[in-house]
Every structure is written in structure tokens, then in C-alpha cells.
Amino acid sequence: MLNEILASLQVLSLPTRTNFRSVTKREVALFKGPNGWGEFSPFLEYEKEEAAHWLGAGIEAAFGEIPLTNREEIEVNATLPAVDTKIDVENILSWYPGAKVVKIKVGGDLELDIQRIENALAVNPNYLIRLDVNGGWTVSQATESVSRIIERIGIEKIQYIEQPVATLDELRELKLPIPVVGDEVIRKAEDPFAINLDGAVDILMLKVSPLGGIKRAKEIAAHHKLPVVVSSALESAVGISHGIKLAAALPELKYACGLGTGKLLANDVADLPIVDGRIKVTNVNPSGMLNYQAAPERIKWWEERIRDSFEVWQARN
């Protein structure tokens, strides 16, 4: 299988439309199997043990079983990075026609965070707001910050907060009047099945690539018996389409999904149009890849990374 992956490998450098996670170009590796295309795009700093889960998700997409679906389209949220001007906020939100929910990056300067939220609500007062902290606050900071945000915009406007603090113990200690979503606490766990989320989070974030694929993500969700939100990890349309299939395969899906992040890329290998706040479940056939090919030295770097990650993945399976 490794030889098949490397034989069809396409390493691409896709420019972003905004600075997202300090990324201005997103490098992704695509490869083809009997089912179509898979993606391997762990962020550059990830070690092979973590990257192997991403490779497993790509292998599942290209070579594994095709999951049955329970729905034909998926509601998605808008994603608002840490931008500060009203014009930027209006522009980015226009990429998500019909979205009813906005995930907003917070955790920096609190006043700027609140202004960002207020600017989003100025675009559409009916938006529900999701706060995304990426574990950047202490317990006391989270308590104070959420209190101030609620004072300014009202608790009824906030759907939930994602990973307000970093650790499981901090999540248990933290008591907030809004639902808490576990993201990093599950996808960064050495064993997502072994951790006890009781009293720590109310909702589980599922990301198909970091969790190793649809089958494993569904097993994690079934194990923890919590409501789930499916989100992306800034993949290309190939990886996001696999996340959409995860969302479509779940028995229940209460929340809009964070699967519209392809709009944060200036160029992508396929279009996943958002219509009335929804994306259709579809197979992606990437095109125009020659336009985005990475430099030869980057291709060699990704080939070696795949070899290292495949060795870890194979040992686990």
C-alpha cells in the first residue's frame, strides 16, 4: 500500500485567504486509491505518532470501506479567524451564505475579541455564536472572560465555547453557564477511549483526520455518549469531503458542523459550495493540481514524512 500511496502522491501548497493558525500556505499531500482520493495534511510541527492518525484517515478514504450515509447535506457554521476590522468581518462572513452559526476565534485581547463578536452580530443579529479558545485560557481567565462576553452580548447569543482551557483537570474545575466543547482534549489524547470526560465537557468535537478516520471517530463518539460536532482541520476539499461523510454517517447530528473551512483557502482542488448554509455530501475529484504543486524539496520532505507515519500506522493496525 505504501508504494501505491507514493506512486500517486501529489504534494500541494494552497494559499489561504486569511492568516489562520499563523498559516498563509497550507501544504497537503493527496494520494489515490480504489475509492478515490485520500488526504494527508497534518500540520508541519506534528510528530509521526500524531501524524499517523491523519495518514490513517487518508488511507481509509482512498482504500477503506465507504460509509453508509444518513443524510444528503450537512449544515455548516461560518468560521471567523482573529480579524479586527468590520470590513474584514463582513467580507469573511459573506463566504458563508445562509449560515446561522458563527465560530469566532477568541483568546487574545479580550476587548478585541468582544468587538469581533459584536461586528459579526452587526452583520446578522440572528447569528448564534461559538467561541473558540484552543485551550488558551486559565480557569480564572475563562471564568472572567466568559462573564464579560455575556455581559456585552447576552448569554442567549452564545451556543457554546470550544476548549476554553487546556487540560482535563482544568475543564472539570471550570464552571461556566454555557456548554463546553472538548476538542484538543480528545484529539490530542494518547488514547481517546481511555479518558473520562464526565463533568468536563458537554459536547464532543470530532475531526476526521486527527482522529484517524470515520470508523474510529464514530467509535469514539459512541464510547463517550455525548452530543457531537464534526469539524475540519483546515484540510483541502478532499479531506473536508471525508469529514462531511463522517457527519453524514452519524446516527444523530444536532449541531451545525465546522466543515466550511475550505472558504479560508484562496485556491482549492475542488469546490464544496455552501447553499443556504449547507454543503452536499459528495465525492471530490480534485483538479488543477499542477497549479499548486509544492517545490521538489517539499515533495521529498512529505514523502519521507509519509514513510515515517506509515510505519507507525502499520504497527498500530
Write out the residue ranges for each language-model feature.
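Catalytic domains of carbohydrate-active enzymes, especially glycoside hydrolases
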Residues: 38-40, 91-107
